[in-house]
């Protein structure tokens, strides 16, 4: 057994089970990860009692939240536990026998509801309200438990932040932002993204050796070499905008926990990764059944069958603007097809972390990619974009459904978004910061697209090496200048040689690029795109 953080392991199961009665929300200890023999450090987010046994919802520290899970008492290693303190002082460690003083509000088992109440027609924002106790469970104590602390909140001194202090600080910050931005952070759709992994710093360019391919250009960087479109060069995580579709994420215990056990979408049964504000009565069911055409949700397969007998849709609503072979794209107006857009956001939230979901979809367009067969058009993925973006964002949110991941559909969505930008005659970029998976996909797409431009360059008639500028690359690809520069830096292709910047590509990079391109069997064909850009500033949204 591999226990991280140098914790010793005690095989006495009885003592472990006996000591778990002292554990409260906010405690940190090694936990056995599901289907592995690893014991990473985890934080207890919530506790419930089921059939006389306590179960613990844990978040593995430094791991993605999609790995969070319910574990049993025997999966906890209680030899060393970090207990949260009421006063927020230095967190101590306990070795099995010693237990902290427990507060009355946390005595016994505390079971939190799995989902907030679903907002009615009068409440558009899908922000969780104060939850009510689920049937058959003990309602949570009044106020915020002092032992609850989100992961990542401990200070550099090893302290765990007190729950009440955290709530007060969070409320102050929210009020301050409202005052600064005039409340613009509210009333907008969406799915904001926080970067989940640090960006590597570009290595220092060296004098190039003899390489077979050179692409040069005077003033290639022209003072903009330090600009990184995704904030990767300075090592800082960029802050999301407080307007448009980028709004702050309000983290609490309810939204930190997965509230849907399983969904059935067409032929696929999918286990969700994150919280989504579906109605609470549905979240208590073992599975939520979703119509793959209109995305309406039902509590049982029988209810879904009745719905399918009445549902006339066999494809997403809106206009089909692209079709090649079995792949189609539909453009959906968030104002004209509001119910579908809201259901799409609910579905996407199950697989997108660090998002705050709002039901105001009017300012957005949704582009849904489908795969066609004899039964209809089945959703593969989608991306959304603002009708009017002041910062030239061509993607607000992007998702490939889990059954279709690792098949090239993610890059196809990205390629289609840039194809739309080409039709609009401008460069575009995704809203930043990107998620971990989104960052990997975009960096891979940018690298392959830019290398494809370089390799296709031919020497001039007099035998001189080909030249190209950053602006030329942007014009050919519709990739924003900052993203082009950051990609060249991440690939370490930019070198300063004899008074000018040059891009050096060796045979190894060329072979790697060709192997990667061979895997991209599906590409966007601009001839199959039938679409005319609209000037949304001159029409009602």
From Swiss-Prot:
MYST-type HAT domain ranges (all copies): 255-533
Gene Ontology CC: histone acetyltransferase complex; NuA4 histone acetyltransferase complex; nucleus; polytene chromosome interband
Residues that hold acetyl-CoA according to the record: 398-400, 405-411, 435, 444
Zn finger intervals (C2HC MYST-type): 288-313
Start-end of Low complexity biased regions: 89-99, 190-216
Annotated localization: Nucleus
Enzyme Commission code: 2.3.1.48
Catalytic center residues: 431
Subunit structure, interactors included: Component of the Tip60 chromatin-remodeling complex which contains the catalytic subunit Tip60 and the subunits Domino, Tra1, Brd8, E(Pc), DMAP1, Pontin, Reptin, Ing3, Act87E, BAP55, Mrg15, MrgBP, Gas41 and YL-1.
Function: Catalytic subunit of the Tip60 chromatin-remodeling complex which is involved in DNA repair. Upon induction of DNA double-strand breaks, acetylates phosphorylated histone H2AV in nucleosomes on 'Lys-4' and exchanges it with unmodified H2AV.
Family: Belongs to the MYST (SAS/MOZ) family.
The protein, known as: Histone acetyltransferase Tip60
Lineage: Eukaryota, Metazoa, Ecdysozoa, Arthropoda, Hexapoda
Gene this chain is encoded by: Tip60
């Amino acid at each position: 057994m591999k226990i991280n953080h140098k914790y010793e392991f005690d095989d006495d199961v009885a003592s472990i089970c006996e000591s778990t009665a002292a554990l409260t929300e906010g405690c940190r200890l090694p936990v056995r990860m599901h289907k592995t023999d690893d014991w990473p450090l985890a934080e207890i987010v919530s506790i419930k009692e089921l059939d006389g046994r306590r179960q613990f919802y844990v978040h593995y520290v430094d791991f993605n939240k999609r790995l969070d899970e319910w574990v049993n008492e025997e999966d906890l290693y209680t030899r060393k536990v970090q207990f949260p303190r009421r006063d927020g002082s230095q967190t101590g460690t306990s070795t099995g026998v010693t237990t902290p003083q427990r507060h009355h509000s946390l005595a016994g088992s505390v079971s939190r509801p799995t989902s907030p109440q679903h907002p009615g027609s009068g409440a558009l924002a899908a922000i969780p309200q104060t939850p009510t106790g689920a049937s058959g469970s003990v309602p949570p104590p009044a106020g915020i438990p002092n032992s609850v602390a989100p992961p990542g909140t401990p200070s550099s001194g090893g302290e765990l932040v007190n729950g009440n202090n955290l709530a007060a600080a969070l409320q102050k910050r929210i009020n301050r932002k409202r005052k600064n931005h005039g409340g613009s952070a509210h009333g907008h759709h969406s799915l904001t993204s926080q970067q989940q992994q640090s960006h590597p710093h570009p290595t220092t360019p060296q004098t190039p050796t003899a390489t077979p391919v050179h692409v040069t250009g005077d003033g290639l960087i022209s003072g903009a070499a330090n600009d990184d479109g995704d904030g990767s060069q300075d090592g800082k995580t960029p802050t999301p905008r407080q307007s448009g579709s980028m709004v702050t994420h309000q983290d609490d215990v309810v939204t930190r926990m997965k509230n849907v056990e399983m969904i059935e979408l067409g032929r696929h049964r999918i286990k969700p990764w994150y919280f989504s504000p579906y109605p609470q009565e549905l979240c208590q069911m073992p599975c939520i059944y979703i119509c793959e055409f209109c995305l309406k949700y039902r509590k049982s397969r029988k209810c879904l069958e009745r719905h399918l007998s009445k549902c006339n849709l066999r494809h997403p609503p809106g206009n089909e603007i692209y079709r090649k072979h079995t792949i189609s794209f539909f453009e959906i107006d968030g104002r004209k097809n509001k119910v579908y857009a809201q259901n799409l956001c609910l579905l996407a939230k199950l697989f997108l972390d660090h998002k705050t979901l709002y039901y105001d979809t009017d300012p957005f367009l949704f582009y849904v990619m489908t795969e066609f067969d004899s039964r209809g058009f089945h959703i593969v993925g989608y991306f959304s974009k603002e009708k009017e973006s002041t910062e030239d964002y061509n993607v607000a949110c992007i998702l490939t459904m889990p059954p279709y991941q690792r098949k090239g559909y993610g890059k196809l969505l990205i390629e289609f978004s840039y194809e739309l930008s080409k039709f609009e005659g401008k460069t575009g970029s995704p809203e930043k910061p990107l998620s971990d998976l989104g960052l990997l996909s975009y960096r891979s797409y940018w690298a392959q697209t830019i290398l494809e431009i370089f390799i296709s360059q031919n020497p001039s008639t007099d035998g001189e090496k080909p030249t190209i500028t950053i602006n030329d690359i942007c014009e050919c690809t519709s990739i924003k200048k900052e993203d082009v520069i950051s990609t060249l830096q991440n690939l370490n292709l930019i070198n300063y040689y004899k008074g000018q910047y040059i891009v050096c590509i060796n045979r190894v990079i060329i072979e790697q690029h060709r192997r990667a391109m061979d895997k991209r069997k599906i590409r966007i064909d601009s001839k199959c795109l039938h679409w005319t850009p609209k000037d949304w500033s001159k029409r009602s949204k």
